[in-house]
Amino acid sequence: MKNLLDLEHKLNYYFNDRNLLKNALLHKSLGNERKEYKNQTNERLELLGDAVLDLIVAEYLYKSYKNASEGPIAKLKAMIVSEPILAKISRQIGVGKFLMLSRGEVMSGGRNRESILADSFEAILGAVYIDSNLDEARVFALSHIKQYIDHIEENEDILDFKSILQEYVQKEFKTVPTYELVAERGPDHMKEFEIQVIVGNYKEKAVARNKKKAEQLSAKALCIKLGVKYNEAL
């Protein structure tokens, strides 16, 4: 087995009880192959780590998106804690070469299998939680997953910008935004809609494949123009 200190460097976490890290890396295939490892596999730590990760990510999103409803937050959370993302984190760390697998699992490519890598990251997080506390586990998890949260945030619609804009405009301008269809372009199966939102002398346009999306995009653009603070982390 590779030097665990090397892995701790990459994890940026040093265990008080390194046996926890060993257990987090011990796959059930080896437990099935060798009886002495049967009760030391990472499945229990994986279960715990899964719950800890759910809490950490849900808490982060709750604090970061004050104006988002439950639905978009749940969608974003599911994407962040998904198997492909967790496997990518494990690959980036290099977890695969430290895994304790059965010979058959090694021969079949287990060190690079997405499901095994994702489960292993959850098991390591569970081990960090047991070895320290929730605060340390939170720092550990976010240090590895934050870049993926940022990437997903940039490419997903999380906030209801129409509601945010309306709330702001009612408070500051004592009116409500109006939306108008500027143009429709393209054939029926690839139609695009250009929508303009108007608040007094302020106007912004956006184009999308459906009217609701175009309205959201135009509202977002006007929020930015007006300096609306719609995504403040606590």
From Swiss-Prot:
GO molecular function: double-stranded RNA binding; metal ion binding; ribonuclease III activity; rRNA binding
Domain (RNase III): residue spans on this chain: 4-133
The keyword Transferase is assigned to this record: no
InterPro entries (UniProt xref): dsRBD_dom (IPR014720), RNase_III (IPR011907), RNase_III_dom (IPR000999), RNase_III_sf (IPR036389)
Cofactor dependency: Mg(2+)
Gene Ontology CC entries for this record: cytosol
Reaction it catalyzes: Endonucleolytic cleavage to 5'-phosphomonoester
Organism superkingdom: Bacteria
HAMAP family attached to this UniProt entry: RNase_III
PANTHER family: RIBONUCLEASE 3, RIBONUCLEASE III
Protein name according to UniProt: Ribonuclease 3
Gene (name only): rnc
